[in-house]
């Protein structure tokens, strides 16, 4: 069940999560691919070529689905070169970002289910072609989407330097 942050109980105390516990916890979160298509650029965190997400090529207007249930915390024109973006807040301080959209289909505060259409593929912002730029962040830190997405052999060729 989804809860707004104002509905969550503040009475429960949670002990700090260690790095090992965090990795084990994140492995249990099952995201779905937000769009079908080939990955044209992977996740990179080295000093010279930073890319905080993956780029998935798809035709303009293709439906983008919520990778997990969550609440829309942003839907509009994003900062920098992101163009139209949707940002979803999920359980356990996990956030997913969907960028370069042609059209956003959700509104701030809306609760969405996993697999629900939230936007369509486009090339808004600084994009060189129609694709979805997809990011996953845990407590504001970018993590490789591949850690949470099901394995797809067609995407093995894309670099992932996370």
Model-derived features: positions:
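A residue-level detector for short acidic-glycine micro-motifs
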Residues: 41, 58, 74, 100-103, ...
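Short hydrophobic beta/alpha edge segments that flank linear recognition/processing sites
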Residues: 56, 84-88, 113-125
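Short, well-structured beta-strand-loop connectors
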Residues: 63-73, 105-121
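Short, small-residue-biased leader/transition segments that mark boundaries at the very start
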Residues: 1-2
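Surface-exposed, glycine-biased beta-strand/turn segments
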Residues: 6-83
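Acidic, glycine-rich catalytic/binding loops that coordinate metals and/or anionic ligands
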Residues: 31, 57, 110, 135-162
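Zn2+-dependent peptidoglycan hydrolase active-site motif and core
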Residues: 67-105, 130, 135
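Active-site loop architecture of trypsin-fold serine endopeptidases
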Residues: 49, 80, 121-133
């Amino acid at each position: 069940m989804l809860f707004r942050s104002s509905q969550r109980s503040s009475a429960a105390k949670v002990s700090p999560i260690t790095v090992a516990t965090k990795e084990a916890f994140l492995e249990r979160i099952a995201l779905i691919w937000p769009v079908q298509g080939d990955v044209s650029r992977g996740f990179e965190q080295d000093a010279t070529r930073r890319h905080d997400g993956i780029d998935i090529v798809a035709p303009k207007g293709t439906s983008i689905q919520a990778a997990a249930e969550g609440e829309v915390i942003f839907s509009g024109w994003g900062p920098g070169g992101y163009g139209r973006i949707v940002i979803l807040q999920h359980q356990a301080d996990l956030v997913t970002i969907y960028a370069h959209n042609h059209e956003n289909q959700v509104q701030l505060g809306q609760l969405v289910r996993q697999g629900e259409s939230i936007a369509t593929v486009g090339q808004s912002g600084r994009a060189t072609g129609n694709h979805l730029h997809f990011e996953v962040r845990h407590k504001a830190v970018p993590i490789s989407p591949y850690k949470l997405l099901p394995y797809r052999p067609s995407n093995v060729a894309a670099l992932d330097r996370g």
